[in-house]
Amino acid sequence: MRKSRDRVEQFPRPLSSIESKEGLRLDSGLGEMNRVLGGGIMKGSVALIAGEPGIGKSTLMLQLAAGIRSEGRVLYISGEESPVQIRLRADRLGVRDSRIEVFSETELSAMLRACGKLKPIVVILDSIQTVHSEDIGSVPGTVNQIKLCAQELIDWAKSHGAALFLVGHVTKEGYIAGPKVIEHMVDTVLYFDSGSAEIRILHCAKNRFGSVDEIGIFEMGEQGLRQVENPAAVFLSQRVGEQPPGVAVAPMYEGSRILLVEIQSLVVPAKGGISRVFSERIDSARVSRMAAVLEKHLKVRLSDQDIYVNVGGGIRISEVGVDLPLCLSLYSARINQPIPPLTAIVGEISLAAEVHPVGHLDRRIRAVQEMGFSRLISPPPKEQKLQVPEFCYPVSSLTEAARTGFQT
């Protein structure tokens, strides 16, 4: 492999001699982006942001370029749009920042020369699939081109202390097309997903400088992406009338905040007598496990049923507190009886159908109360000092939860 162009030569030095201020973060100007990154953009870091074509990655990157709270320059390199197209999109978004340098280019050496001349604090490349090097005998988008071009850009960013954002496209199957091969080379991997028609969710799959549990929530509008002011309720359906069977509301702990989400279940007779589980937003193994617990302890037959599970708004749920609302959602769908309105449910379920405590119960109680719910079915609090309000119904078993859950 060739030596990277314009690379600053580095030498070993004692760990104790390195000042922590060398790792200062930049304020992106987007609170949700700062949250997901762990407090802002780390200087010298490299982030891969992936999503389906048309989801809004370019819009997010242009708004990030305009929002960065720093005096330095931002270099926005596009291999897919001309400068005029970028300007038209910037006008629509209300972006008018002289610090943003726009460069329409796909050749690696030209990009590195521009970086060396401008010395930007942040470089945005949209997208990595379009980059090619004349020294590599293959077309843009191939594994060799992506891997070697990315390495050159990463070397430059690391040696000059500039933050680098690489945009990549995701296939229909949800995989990063091409850039999957550089995930191990970058510091952060971000996915930009569509929650609903307007909602966009930014979540982290890898982060060397922060948690991978945080998510950012945006709303897409005519003027671009807007940060959601009340994310706790953004995933709840605004329905009129009675809640249908199979729907359970759960206060889930995502990153550092509580989100109220709808667990939606549909249970129908299996075709051909073979039961199947269809679930994208909750792990299918968890759904199968909860179905087995239900069949064993509540005596409802599910082994001859097809089970469909969804989470309203498109958010993915992995925390254990989803067990109890998932069980009651499945039970509600199977007996075709709705859970009473304004009821929220949370709790972990063991294979013995015991309801185990969950973390941050006090914050979940507060979030449910603020959203106007009249009942919360939950495990007993782990903290003995926690005062449980009257609208909370502590349960210790799945049988007790089912009995309590369907009381009006």
Residue ranges of each PLM-predicted region?
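Conserved RecA-like ASCE P-loop NTPase motor core of nucleic-acid helicases/translocases
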Residues: 74-78
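Conserved helicase motor
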Residues: 104-106
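Peripheral, non-AAA+ core regions of ATP-driven protein-machinery
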Residues: 1-37, 42-48, 55-62, 66, ...
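P-loop (Walker A) phosphate-binding loop of NTP-binding proteins
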Residues: 52, 79
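Conserved Rossmann-like nucleotide-cofactor binding loop
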Residues: 82
